[in-house]
């Protein structure tokens, strides 16, 4: 049986942190002038994959 291959796009977007999968935050790459400093600071906080998507992300990362 061939080796499982990690989805390379997913590998670049998600990082494994202890028992959680860390992900990036959307809406922080451009059009930042209309967003308040408080809102932009909130976008820098770490985000984690929710339980509904956890199994599918684990399959992409060959962790299942």
UniProtKB/Swiss-Prot annotation:
GO molecular function: structural constituent of ribosome
HAMAP family: Ribosomal_bL35
Recorded name of the encoding gene: rpmI
Single GO cellular component term: cytosolic large ribosomal subunit
Disulfide pattern: none
UniProt keywords, alphabetically: Ribonucleoprotein, Ribosomal protein
PROSITE patterns assigned to the protein according to its UniProt record, in alphabetical order: RIBOSOMAL_L35 (PS00936)
Protein name, UniProt field: Large ribosomal subunit protein bL35
Database matches in Pfam families: Ribosomal_L35p
Source organism, top-level taxon: Bacteria
GO biological-process terms attached to the record: translation
Family named by the database record: Belongs to the bacterial ribosomal protein bL35 family.
InterPro entries: Ribosomal_bL35 (IPR001706), Ribosomal_bL35-like (IPR021137), Ribosomal_bL35_CS (IPR018265), Ribosomal_bL35_sf (IPR037229)
């Amino acid at each position: 049986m061939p080796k499982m291959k990690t989805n390379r796009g997913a590998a670049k977007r998600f990082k494994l942190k202890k028992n959680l999968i860390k992900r990036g935050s959307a809406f922080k790459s451009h059009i930042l002038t209309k967003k308040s400093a408080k809102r932009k600071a909130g976008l820098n906080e770490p985000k984690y994959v929710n339980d509904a998507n956890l199994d599918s992300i684990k399959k992409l990362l060959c962790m299942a």
